[in-house]
């Protein structure tokens, strides 16, 4: 199988080729078509298997195809991650793919000055990669709008649960429009948390 067979646009195929990749990994080959179909997805893959590209590529492409860019951009994709290090890594990949399709992304996490994050959000962002706590901080301050989020990704969800982020994640979902994707993700988390308690 090649990346050409995954219905990716020329801009993203070029980005992939620039990175030196020629063949999709198993997680990419399985996940990308499912995401393109608009289905919810629960997937697991080890670090280094191309997991981020598996969700980033189809999301970036679909964001560029639907809802033409508005003058003032509001986030339409949200990726929650457990740590600032992972936020930086995922955000970098989102930027690499998104810039080829004129999409803007940013990372949001604690331990740094919030003012610079507020300024970036104010300029308009399509994709936000965030840790749950700092995202909630922005939501409660009113410095981020989550009403138009179409895609929610919980990256390393098990680790977020292990770190005790379940309540924060559920609060984040309260700020989102309750689409099928969000509701399904929330139910899965609630069930997982119940299993951990039992």
Question: What are the functions of these language-model segments?
Answer:
Residues 45-49:
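The conserved Walker
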Residues 1-44, 54, 155:
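Conserved pre-motif I regulatory segment
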Residues 145-154, 158-198:
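Post-DEXD/H (motif II) to motif III coupling segment of the RecA-like Helicase ATP-binding lobe
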Residues 37-43, 75-77, 125-126, 192-195:
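Pre-Walker A (Motif I) flank of P-loop NTPase domains
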Residues 5, 10-21, 68-140, 148-151:
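Conserved nucleic-acid-binding Ia/Ib motif block in the N-terminal RecA-like helicase ATPase lobe
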């Amino acid at each position: 199988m090649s990346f050409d067979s995954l219905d990716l646009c020329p801009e993203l195929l070029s980005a992939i080729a620039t990175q030196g990749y020629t063949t999709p990994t198993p997680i990419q080959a399985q996940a990308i078509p499912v995401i393109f179909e608009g289905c919810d997805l629960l997937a697991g893959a080890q670090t280094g298997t191309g997991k981020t590209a598996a969700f980033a590529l189809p999301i970036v492409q679909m964001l560029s195809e639907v809802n033409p860019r508005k003058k003032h951009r509001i986030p339409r994709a949200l990726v929650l991650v457990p740590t600032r290090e992972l936020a930086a890594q995922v955000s970098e990949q989102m930027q690499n793919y998104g810039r080829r399709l004129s999409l803007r992304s940013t990372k949001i996490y604690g331990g740094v000055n919030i003012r610079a994050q507020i300024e970036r959000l104010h300029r308009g962002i399509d994709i936000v990669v965030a840790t749950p706590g700092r995202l909630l901080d922005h939501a409660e301050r009113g410095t981020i709008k989550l009403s138009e989020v179409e895609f929610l990704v919980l990256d390393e969800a098990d680790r977020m649960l292990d770190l005790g982020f379940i309540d924060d994640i559920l609060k984040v979902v309260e700020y989102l429009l309750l689409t099928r994707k969000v509701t399904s993700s929330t139910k899965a988390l609630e069930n997982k948390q119940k299993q951990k308690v039992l």
